[in-house]
Amino acid sequence: MSWNNLHPGLVMILFGFIILALPEKCRKYLTLAGAVCAFCSFWMMDSHSTLPYKVTDNLTLQLIDTNGVSMVFLMVFVTIGVINAIYAMDLQNKWEAGITCIYAGSNMGIVLAGDLLSFIVFWEISAFASTYIIYAR
């Protein structure tokens, strides 16, 4: 895997799980760091990036398959993620911050999905995270 194929959605999901595992005082900086890292990985991608992941001999997941339209939508989602991280630095608790990062990352994964199975997996992660965010209030 080269650096121009670093998945911004998986970066945000990873930071979301790290936020959930670490103490509360690390939350605000990790939320912003995750969004900035996802933004940087977006800028390293080109409009023809691919990231296949071979599960078995017969099954290969296409985690990244970009074109011009997906890059525009990804730019919107990454920018919203950074703005959300800046806005929410003092408003959320640890669980809301972690799940919000997971939600943002799964939405980026939906945009970048190159096959139906990857799309459905990221969609279900997004559905779980959004349900938690709604019922957390």
Regions found by a protein language model. Give the residues of each.
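Transmembrane helix-loop-helix hairpins at membrane boundaries of multipass inner-membrane proteins
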Residues: 1-98
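Alpha-helical multi-pass transmembrane bundles of energy-transducing inner-membrane proteins
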Residues: 98-137
